[in-house]
Amino acid sequence: MTSFPASHGFGPRKRGYQMDLTNVQPVENKPAWISMKSPLEKEIANEYEALKVTERKEDTQDYNEPELHNSNDPTVDLYADTYATQAATESDSELEDALFSQLDEFDDTAYREQRLEMLKKEFARVEAAKEKGHMQFLTVENEREVMDFTLSSKKVVIHFYHPDFIRCKIIDSHLEKIAKVHWETKFIRIEAANAPFLVVKLGLKVLPAVLCYVNSQLVDKIIGFADLGNKDDFETSLLEFRLLKSSAIDRLKEESSSNKSIYHDELQNNQSDDSDFFE
């Protein structure tokens, strides 16, 4: 009876001078015949994938955003701007009363009632958006949250940052201002070190990196400051206009003194090329 070497039992098998690593290679590197499944295995795999999709839909139901649309209503825009700047000192009801009082100037009763009803609906949408985390710049801790927000929100702007990079802090300051006046978009950020899978999948090698998603589709990437004048003291309106071109936001706000550069004096001594490479 022929005896076989012990090496033919377990582990890699010898083929001449070449080791057969079929059983220890990643799935994507295995020969096609290794990946072939029986009909029963395929059925089980399909059922498992369907179950995962169902579970994911159930998990993301809590993240569903209200349907927000651009009303092109200057009064509603005024409400959002006023809320962003005065919410800390005045209640929502006081702000609404002040805006509703502006409608008293119209003599046309039918027009006034129509506008009043429209404003109430828009205010309800703004309040619903606030409850879902809009009008603020959220920090998330893991990749699952990023993907959930991307799938459940109509418009999402994501900043991949490093806590020690000065230019990441500059982008944070601009996005925080923009988020307060654009309730139709969700603004989030995540430390790049906490998102290794997304960093590799998206090919991010330079920080800061701002990614814009509309209807779960990537529509724009802003890497470093090359598209923002390649200088640290750019104005907030420049980034806002870039987001508008990408359809990540619906409209531009009126430029005011508070909408100009937020680049602080204490950062002016750090003028080195700080588009930071992320390893």
Curated annotation (Swiss-Prot):
It comes from the Eukaryota. Residues 137-248 form the Thioredoxin domain. Keywords: Chaperone, Cytoplasm, Nucleus, Pheromone response, Phosphoprotein, Signal transduction inhibitor. Pfam families: Thioredoxin. It is found in: Cytoplasm; Nucleus. Signal peptide: none annotated. Residues 56-70, 254-267 have a biased composition (Basic and acidic residues). The keyword Phosphoprotein applies. GO terms for biological process: negative regulation of signal transduction; protein folding; response to pheromone. The modification Phosphoserine is found at residues 272, 275. The keyword Nucleotide-binding does not apply. One of its GO terms (cellular component) is cytosol. Residues 56-75, 254-279 are annotated as: Disordered. Inhibits early G-protein signaling events following pheromone stimulation. May help create heterodimerizable beta-tubulin by facilitating the efficient transfer of nascent beta-tubulin polypeptides to the folding apparatus. Belongs to the phosducin family. This is Thioredoxin domain-containing protein plp1.
